[in-house]
A protein has these predicted regions:
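Bacterial N-terminal signal peptides that target proteins for export
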Residues: 3-17
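N-terminal carbohydrate-binding accessory modules
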Residues: 14, 22, 31-91
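Juxtamembrane cytosolic interface motif at the C-terminal end of transmembrane helices
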Residues: 27-29
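Short amphipathic alpha-helices and their capping/turn segments at secondary-structure boundaries
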Residues: 33-36, 79-85, 112-114, 207-210, ...
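Feature marks short, surface-exposed loop/turn motifs that line or immediately flank catalytic pockets
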Residues: 48-52, 98-100, 131, 168, ...
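Extracellular glycoside hydrolase catalytic/binding regions
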Residues: 58-73, 141-161, 165-293, 297-301, ...
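Aromatic-lined substrate-binding rim segments of carbohydrate-active enzymes
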Residues: 76-131, 142-143, 184-192, 272-290
Length: 333
Protein backbone atom coordinates (compact mmCIF):
# COMPACT_ATOMS: atom_id res chain seq x y z
CA UNK A 1 0.00 0.00 0.00
CA UNK A 2 1.09 3.54 -0.52
CA UNK A 3 2.53 5.88 2.09
CA UNK A 4 1.42 9.56 2.18
CA UNK A 5 3.03 11.57 -0.61
CA UNK A 6 6.23 13.15 0.72
CA UNK A 7 8.51 15.96 -0.46
CA UNK A 8 11.36 15.11 -2.81
CA UNK A 9 14.79 14.66 -1.27
CA UNK A 10 18.13 13.12 -2.14
CA UNK A 11 17.34 13.01 -5.88
CA UNK A 12 20.61 14.51 -7.08
CA UNK A 13 22.67 12.18 -4.89
CA UNK A 14 20.67 9.18 -6.00
CA UNK A 15 20.92 10.00 -9.69
CA UNK A 16 24.67 10.48 -9.41
CA UNK A 17 24.96 7.10 -7.78
CA UNK A 18 22.79 5.61 -10.51
CA UNK A 19 25.50 6.51 -13.00
CA UNK A 20 27.93 4.42 -11.02
CA UNK A 21 25.42 1.59 -10.94
CA UNK A 22 25.18 1.59 -14.72
CA UNK A 23 28.92 1.16 -14.93
CA UNK A 24 29.05 -1.71 -12.48
CA UNK A 25 30.20 -5.03 -13.79
CA UNK A 26 28.05 -7.52 -11.94
CA UNK A 27 28.39 -11.19 -12.75
CA UNK A 28 25.20 -13.23 -12.52
CA UNK A 29 24.05 -16.56 -13.88
CA UNK A 30 22.65 -16.44 -17.40
CA UNK A 31 18.90 -16.87 -17.09
CA UNK A 32 16.63 -18.55 -19.62
CA UNK A 33 14.27 -16.46 -21.75
CA UNK A 34 10.99 -15.49 -20.14
CA UNK A 35 7.91 -17.16 -21.56
CA UNK A 36 5.10 -15.78 -19.38
CA UNK A 37 2.53 -13.39 -20.83
CA UNK A 38 1.00 -10.98 -18.35
CA UNK A 39 -2.33 -12.82 -18.31
CA UNK A 40 -0.47 -15.68 -16.68
CA UNK A 41 0.11 -13.68 -13.49
CA UNK A 42 -2.66 -14.57 -11.05
CA UNK A 43 -1.17 -13.33 -7.85
CA UNK A 44 -1.31 -12.06 -4.31
CA UNK A 45 0.94 -9.93 -2.13
CA UNK A 46 2.22 -11.48 1.09
CA UNK A 47 2.94 -8.43 3.21
CA UNK A 48 4.51 -7.37 6.49
CA UNK A 49 1.80 -6.49 9.02
CA UNK A 50 3.69 -3.27 9.81
CA UNK A 51 3.67 -2.44 6.09
CA UNK A 52 6.50 -3.18 3.68
CA UNK A 53 7.99 0.29 4.11
CA UNK A 54 10.42 -0.52 6.88
CA UNK A 55 13.84 0.63 8.03
CA UNK A 56 14.61 -2.87 9.29
CA UNK A 57 13.82 -6.31 7.95
CA UNK A 58 10.60 -6.86 6.04
CA UNK A 59 8.96 -9.91 7.57
CA UNK A 60 5.74 -11.12 5.91
CA UNK A 61 2.75 -11.89 8.11
CA UNK A 62 3.13 -15.17 10.00
CA UNK A 63 6.93 -15.22 9.95
CA UNK A 64 9.19 -14.13 12.81
CA UNK A 65 12.65 -12.59 12.86
CA UNK A 66 13.89 -15.55 14.89
CA UNK A 67 12.73 -18.14 12.34
CA UNK A 68 15.28 -20.38 10.67
CA UNK A 69 15.30 -21.22 6.97
CA UNK A 70 13.46 -24.48 7.62
CA UNK A 71 10.83 -22.74 9.75
CA UNK A 72 10.25 -20.06 7.12
CA UNK A 73 10.08 -22.72 4.42
CA UNK A 74 7.51 -24.75 6.35
CA UNK A 75 5.25 -21.76 7.02
CA UNK A 76 5.58 -20.45 3.47
CA UNK A 77 4.86 -23.91 2.09
CA UNK A 78 1.59 -24.00 4.03
CA UNK A 79 0.61 -20.48 3.02
CA UNK A 80 1.48 -20.81 -0.64
CA UNK A 81 -0.52 -24.02 -0.82
CA UNK A 82 -3.44 -22.06 0.66
CA UNK A 83 -3.01 -19.27 -1.89
CA UNK A 84 -3.13 -21.92 -4.62
CA UNK A 85 -5.98 -24.00 -3.22
CA UNK A 86 -8.17 -21.25 -1.75
CA UNK A 87 -7.75 -18.66 -4.49
CA UNK A 88 -6.25 -20.28 -7.56
CA UNK A 89 -3.21 -18.01 -7.35
CA UNK A 90 -0.03 -18.90 -9.21
CA UNK A 91 2.08 -15.84 -8.35
CA UNK A 92 3.44 -14.51 -5.06
CA UNK A 93 4.83 -10.99 -4.68
CA UNK A 94 7.32 -10.69 -1.84
CA UNK A 95 9.01 -7.56 -0.43
CA UNK A 96 12.70 -6.97 0.14
CA UNK A 97 14.81 -4.02 1.23
CA UNK A 98 18.57 -3.66 1.77
CA UNK A 99 18.62 -4.67 5.46
CA UNK A 100 16.54 -7.77 4.72
CA UNK A 101 19.10 -8.99 2.19
CA UNK A 102 22.40 -7.76 3.62
CA UNK A 103 21.80 -9.13 7.11
CA UNK A 104 21.13 -12.57 8.58
CA UNK A 105 17.40 -12.53 7.76
CA UNK A 106 18.16 -13.22 4.09
CA UNK A 107 19.40 -16.73 4.85
CA UNK A 108 16.06 -17.58 6.44
CA UNK A 109 13.86 -15.48 4.17
CA UNK A 110 14.97 -17.37 1.09
CA UNK A 111 12.86 -20.19 2.47
CA UNK A 112 9.72 -18.25 1.51
CA UNK A 113 10.90 -17.82 -2.07
CA UNK A 114 12.01 -21.43 -2.32
CA UNK A 115 8.74 -22.79 -0.91
CA UNK A 116 6.70 -20.76 -3.39
CA UNK A 117 8.86 -21.98 -6.26
CA UNK A 118 8.53 -25.56 -5.02
CA UNK A 119 4.75 -25.11 -5.25
CA UNK A 120 5.11 -24.05 -8.90
CA UNK A 121 4.38 -20.40 -8.22
CA UNK A 122 5.94 -17.47 -9.98
CA UNK A 123 7.66 -15.16 -7.51
CA UNK A 124 7.92 -11.39 -7.93
CA UNK A 125 10.66 -10.01 -5.70
CA UNK A 126 9.98 -6.31 -5.23
CA UNK A 127 12.19 -3.75 -3.50
CA UNK A 128 10.58 -1.30 -1.09
CA UNK A 129 12.21 1.88 0.08
CA UNK A 130 13.01 2.09 3.77
CA UNK A 131 10.51 3.87 5.98
CA UNK A 132 12.73 6.93 6.44
CA UNK A 133 12.84 7.58 2.69
CA UNK A 134 10.59 9.69 0.50
CA UNK A 135 10.03 7.49 -2.51
CA UNK A 136 13.70 7.53 -3.45
CA UNK A 137 16.45 5.00 -2.86
CA UNK A 138 17.98 5.68 0.55
CA UNK A 139 21.45 4.31 -0.22
CA UNK A 140 22.29 3.50 -3.84
CA UNK A 141 25.27 1.30 -2.94
CA UNK A 142 23.16 -0.75 -0.54
CA UNK A 143 20.41 -1.03 -3.15
CA UNK A 144 22.94 -2.19 -5.76
CA UNK A 145 24.44 -4.75 -3.38
CA UNK A 146 20.99 -6.02 -2.44
CA UNK A 147 20.11 -6.68 -6.05
CA UNK A 148 23.48 -8.24 -6.77
CA UNK A 149 22.80 -10.76 -4.00
CA UNK A 150 19.22 -11.45 -5.06
CA UNK A 151 19.96 -11.78 -8.77
CA UNK A 152 22.95 -14.00 -8.07
CA UNK A 153 20.67 -16.31 -6.08
CA UNK A 154 17.65 -16.36 -8.40
CA UNK A 155 18.68 -14.94 -11.76
CA UNK A 156 18.85 -18.42 -13.23
CA UNK A 157 15.29 -19.37 -12.23
CA UNK A 158 12.79 -18.56 -14.94
CA UNK A 159 9.92 -18.33 -12.46
CA UNK A 160 11.45 -15.44 -10.53
CA UNK A 161 10.72 -11.87 -11.61
CA UNK A 162 12.55 -8.78 -10.39
CA UNK A 163 10.93 -5.45 -9.53
CA UNK A 164 13.78 -2.97 -8.97
CA UNK A 165 11.74 -0.47 -6.95
CA UNK A 166 8.17 -0.27 -5.71
CA UNK A 167 6.41 3.10 -6.01
CA UNK A 168 9.29 5.44 -6.97
CA UNK A 169 7.22 8.47 -6.04
CA UNK A 170 10.17 10.70 -5.22
CA UNK A 171 11.35 10.79 -8.83
CA UNK A 172 10.04 12.38 -11.99
CA UNK A 173 9.36 9.92 -14.79
CA UNK A 174 12.60 10.82 -16.59
CA UNK A 175 14.64 10.41 -13.41
CA UNK A 176 13.03 7.07 -12.66
CA UNK A 177 13.51 5.81 -16.23
CA UNK A 178 17.21 6.67 -15.95
CA UNK A 179 17.58 4.70 -12.73
CA UNK A 180 15.58 1.75 -14.07
CA UNK A 181 17.64 1.61 -17.26
CA UNK A 182 20.78 1.65 -15.12
CA UNK A 183 19.46 -1.42 -13.32
CA UNK A 184 18.90 -3.15 -16.65
CA UNK A 185 22.46 -2.37 -17.72
CA UNK A 186 23.93 -3.59 -14.45
CA UNK A 187 21.96 -6.85 -14.54
CA UNK A 188 21.92 -7.38 -18.27
CA UNK A 189 21.97 -11.17 -17.99
CA UNK A 190 18.43 -11.09 -16.61
CA UNK A 191 15.98 -11.31 -19.53
CA UNK A 192 14.00 -8.10 -19.78
CA UNK A 193 10.80 -10.11 -19.84
CA UNK A 194 11.51 -11.03 -16.23
CA UNK A 195 11.98 -7.44 -15.05
CA UNK A 196 8.92 -5.50 -13.89
CA UNK A 197 9.42 -1.74 -13.99
CA UNK A 198 7.26 0.44 -11.75
CA UNK A 199 5.12 3.12 -13.25
CA UNK A 200 5.69 6.75 -12.39
CA UNK A 201 4.76 7.98 -8.92
CA UNK A 202 2.96 5.35 -6.89
CA UNK A 203 3.13 3.02 -9.89
CA UNK A 204 0.03 4.94 -10.92
CA UNK A 205 0.76 5.49 -14.64
CA UNK A 206 2.89 3.40 -17.00
CA UNK A 207 2.67 5.47 -20.19
CA UNK A 208 6.10 7.11 -19.92
CA UNK A 209 7.81 3.85 -19.01
CA UNK A 210 6.02 2.00 -21.79
CA UNK A 211 7.10 4.60 -24.36
CA UNK A 212 10.74 4.58 -23.27
CA UNK A 213 13.06 2.74 -25.66
CA UNK A 214 15.48 2.35 -22.74
CA UNK A 215 12.94 0.06 -21.06
CA UNK A 216 11.83 -1.86 -24.14
CA UNK A 217 11.05 -5.51 -23.54
CA UNK A 218 10.38 -5.12 -19.84
CA UNK A 219 7.09 -5.69 -18.08
CA UNK A 220 5.41 -2.74 -16.38
CA UNK A 221 3.91 -2.46 -12.89
CA UNK A 222 0.71 -0.52 -12.26
CA UNK A 223 -1.00 0.10 -8.93
CA UNK A 224 -4.58 1.26 -8.56
CA UNK A 225 -6.92 1.61 -5.60
CA UNK A 226 -10.57 2.46 -5.17
CA UNK A 227 -9.69 5.34 -2.86
CA UNK A 228 -8.01 7.22 -5.71
CA UNK A 229 -11.36 8.50 -6.99
CA UNK A 230 -14.95 8.61 -5.80
CA UNK A 231 -16.52 6.98 -8.86
CA UNK A 232 -19.36 4.53 -8.29
CA UNK A 233 -19.77 3.14 -11.81
CA UNK A 234 -17.71 0.51 -13.52
CA UNK A 235 -17.47 2.51 -16.74
CA UNK A 236 -15.90 5.46 -14.92
CA UNK A 237 -13.31 3.21 -13.30
CA UNK A 238 -12.56 1.51 -16.63
CA UNK A 239 -11.88 4.91 -18.19
CA UNK A 240 -9.64 5.81 -15.25
CA UNK A 241 -7.76 2.52 -15.54
CA UNK A 242 -7.24 2.83 -19.29
CA UNK A 243 -5.78 6.31 -18.87
CA UNK A 244 -3.23 4.85 -16.47
CA UNK A 245 -2.37 1.95 -18.77
CA UNK A 246 -1.63 4.39 -21.58
CA UNK A 247 -2.00 1.76 -24.28
CA UNK A 248 0.51 -0.64 -22.69
CA UNK A 249 -1.85 -3.23 -21.22
CA UNK A 250 -0.05 -6.02 -23.05
CA UNK A 251 3.11 -5.37 -21.00
CA UNK A 252 1.44 -4.44 -17.72
CA UNK A 253 0.89 -6.39 -14.54
CA UNK A 254 -1.27 -4.71 -11.92
CA UNK A 255 0.91 -5.60 -8.95
CA UNK A 256 -1.38 -3.91 -6.40
CA UNK A 257 -5.12 -3.35 -6.30
CA UNK A 258 -7.79 -4.31 -3.81
CA UNK A 259 -10.80 -3.45 -1.73
CA UNK A 260 -12.14 -4.07 1.78
CA UNK A 261 -12.69 -7.79 2.26
CA UNK A 262 -13.46 -8.08 5.97
CA UNK A 263 -16.31 -5.56 6.11
CA UNK A 264 -19.04 -7.65 4.48
CA UNK A 265 -19.10 -6.06 1.02
CA UNK A 266 -20.69 -8.23 -1.67
CA UNK A 267 -18.48 -7.82 -4.73
CA UNK A 268 -20.93 -9.57 -7.04
CA UNK A 269 -23.46 -6.72 -6.81
CA UNK A 270 -23.57 -2.92 -7.18
CA UNK A 271 -21.07 -2.75 -10.03
CA UNK A 272 -22.75 0.47 -11.07
CA UNK A 273 -23.77 1.82 -7.68
CA UNK A 274 -20.94 1.18 -5.25
CA UNK A 275 -17.45 2.62 -5.03
CA UNK A 276 -15.46 -0.49 -4.17
CA UNK A 277 -17.66 -2.97 -6.03
CA UNK A 278 -17.49 -0.95 -9.24
CA UNK A 279 -13.74 -0.44 -8.85
CA UNK A 280 -12.91 -4.12 -8.33
CA UNK A 281 -15.28 -5.07 -11.15
CA UNK A 282 -13.58 -2.60 -13.50
CA UNK A 283 -10.11 -3.96 -12.79
CA UNK A 284 -11.09 -7.61 -12.98
CA UNK A 285 -13.33 -7.28 -16.04
CA UNK A 286 -10.67 -5.28 -17.90
CA UNK A 287 -7.92 -7.69 -16.90
CA UNK A 288 -9.99 -10.58 -18.19
CA UNK A 289 -10.98 -8.90 -21.46
CA UNK A 290 -7.58 -7.32 -22.20
CA UNK A 291 -5.50 -10.26 -21.02
CA UNK A 292 -3.24 -8.73 -18.39
CA UNK A 293 -2.27 -10.13 -15.02
CA UNK A 294 -3.12 -8.88 -11.55
CA UNK A 295 -1.60 -9.32 -8.11
CA UNK A 296 -4.09 -8.62 -5.35
CA UNK A 297 -3.24 -6.52 -2.27
CA UNK A 298 -3.17 -8.13 0.03
CA UNK A 299 -3.26 -11.87 -0.07
CA UNK A 300 -2.28 -11.96 3.59
CA UNK A 301 -1.77 -9.00 5.93
CA UNK A 302 -3.39 -9.25 9.34
CA UNK A 303 -4.91 -5.95 10.41
CA UNK A 304 -5.51 -4.80 6.83
CA UNK A 305 -9.18 -5.12 5.92
CA UNK A 306 -8.15 -5.65 2.29
CA UNK A 307 -6.58 -9.01 3.22
CA UNK A 308 -8.04 -11.83 1.15
CA UNK A 309 -6.84 -14.50 3.59
CA UNK A 310 -6.87 -14.78 7.39
CA UNK A 311 -5.04 -17.11 9.73
CA UNK A 312 -6.99 -20.26 10.56
CA UNK A 313 -4.99 -22.56 12.80
CA UNK A 314 -1.81 -23.40 10.93
CA UNK A 315 -3.43 -22.57 7.61
CA UNK A 316 -5.39 -19.79 5.94
CA UNK A 317 -9.03 -19.24 5.05
CA UNK A 318 -10.87 -16.81 2.78
CA UNK A 319 -12.27 -13.60 4.24
CA UNK A 320 -14.86 -12.82 1.54
CA UNK A 321 -16.25 -15.44 -0.83
CA UNK A 322 -17.70 -12.87 -3.23
CA UNK A 323 -14.37 -11.08 -3.37
CA UNK A 324 -12.61 -14.33 -4.16
CA UNK A 325 -15.09 -15.04 -6.95
CA UNK A 326 -14.58 -11.59 -8.48
CA UNK A 327 -10.79 -11.75 -8.27
CA UNK A 328 -10.77 -15.23 -9.81
CA UNK A 329 -12.99 -13.93 -12.62
CA UNK A 330 -10.31 -11.41 -13.47
CA UNK A 331 -7.77 -14.23 -13.56
CA UNK A 332 -9.79 -16.03 -16.21
CA UNK A 333 -11.48 -18.65 -14.05
Amino acid sequence: MSAPAPAHRRIARTLAAATLLAASALVVAQAPPAVAATSQFKGVNWADTRDNYNSGWVIPDGLAASDSYSQVYSIADSYTKAFVNNLGANTLRLPINPPSVSQSWWGAYKGAIDAALHNNMKVIIGAWTESSSVGTITDMTAWQNMWSTVVSAYGGNGNVYFEPLNEPYGYSSSQWISIASSWLSAFSSVPRGRVIIAGTGYDDHVGDEGASSALSGTLLSLHMYGTWASSTTESAWVSNLNSRLGGYASRTVITEFGGPMTTGINYLTNHNNGQYQSFVAAVTDTARSDGFGTVYWAGLKTGDNYSMEAHNGSGLSNTNSSGVTQIRWGWGY
